[in-house]
C-alpha cells in the first residue's frame, strides 16, 4: 500500500495520517522526519541537508530526492508507506515515480483531503492558546467555558500572530498555487482520490477506509 497524502493547512491531514498508519501498519514518512533521521544518522545526504538547514536555506531537490530514495528503500517500507509533505512539485513527483520504478513499485493512491478556503479560514483563525500553560482551544470546535480564559489554569488566551486572517489567507493562497499543478499531474496519472475533508473526522476516515478497501493490507 503505497500512499501519498495531500491537503491544505487545516484540512486535518495529521489526524487522518495517524489513523491510516495505525490501521494498516505502514510507516508515516514526513519530509521533516526524513531530514531529522538522515541528519541523526549522519548519512552523506543528511549532512548535506544539515548544511543548508543550518544556513536557513531550502534543501535542494537533488538532496531531498536522495533522502527520499534512501528512506523508501528501508525494510519497514516493504509493505508500503504513507508519504506526507513530499512531493511538493511536479519535478519531485516525477522523481518519486523514478524511485518507485527502481524499487519495482507504483503509487496506489494520492489521497487529497479537500476543504474549501472559507472552512479552512474558520478552522485556522479560530485557534486560541493559553499564555500560561499552552493549552489549545478553538472558538468554534473547542471553546473555553469562559471567553478568553483557560479552563485548566485560568490563564489568558491569545491568538498566534500567524493565525490571524490576513496571514492565514496568504498562506492558503500560496499553498493552493503550489499544489494545483501537482494535483493535475496525479489526476492525469489516475492516482488522485479526492476526499471531502469538511465532514466529521470519523466520516472522513470512513471514506478513506472505503477507498483503501480494495487494496491488500
From Swiss-Prot:
Pathway(s) it belongs to: Purine metabolism; AMP biosynthesis via salvage pathway; AMP from ADP: step 1/1
One GO biological process term: AMP salvage
Binding site for AMP: 31, 36, 57-59, 85-88, 92, 160, 171
GO cellular component: cytoplasm
The family this protein is said to belong to: Belongs to the adenylate kinase family.
Subunit structure: Monomer.
Name assigned to this protein: Adenylate kinase
Organism per entry: Bacillus pumilus (strain SAFR-032)
Gene name of this polypeptide: adk
Amino acid at each position: 500500500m503505497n500512499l501519498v497524502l495531500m491537503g491544505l493547512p487545516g484540512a486535518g491531514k495529521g489526524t487522518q495520517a495517524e489513523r491510516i498508519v495505525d490501521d494498516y501498519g505502514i510507516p508515516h514518512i514526513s519530509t521533516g522526519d526524513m531530514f531529522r533521521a538522515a541528519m541523526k544518522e549522519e548519512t552523506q545526504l543528511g549532512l548535506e541537508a544539515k548544511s543548508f538547514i543550518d544556513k536557513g536555506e531550502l534543501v535542494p531537490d537533488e538532496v531531498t530526492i536522495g533522502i527520499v530514495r534512501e528512506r523508501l528503500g528501508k525494510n519497514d517500507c516493504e509493505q508500503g508507506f504513507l508519504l506526507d509533505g513530499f512531493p511538493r512539485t511536479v519535478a519531485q513527483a516525477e522523481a518519486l515515480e523514478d524511485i518507485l520504478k527502481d524499487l519495482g513499485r507504483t503509487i496506489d493512491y494520492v489521497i487529497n483531503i479537500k476543504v474549501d478556503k472559507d472552512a479552512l479560514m474558520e478552522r485556522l483563525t479560530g485557534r486560541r492558546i493559553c499564555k500560561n500553560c499552552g493549552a489549545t482551544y478553538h472558538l468554534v470546535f473547542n471553546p473555553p467555558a469562559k471567553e478568553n480564559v483557560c479552563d485548566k489554569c485560568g490563564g489568558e488566551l491569545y491568538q498566534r500572530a500567524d493565525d490571524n486572517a490576513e496571514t492565514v489567507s496568504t498562506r492558503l493562497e500560496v499553498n493552493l498555487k503550489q499544489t494545483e499543478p501537482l494535483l493535475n499531474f496525479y489526476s492525469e496519472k489516475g492516482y488522485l482520490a479526492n476526499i471531502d475533508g469538511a465532514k466529521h473526522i470519523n466520516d472522513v476516515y470512513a471514506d478513506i477506509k472505503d477507498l483503501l478497501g480494495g487494496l491488500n493490507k
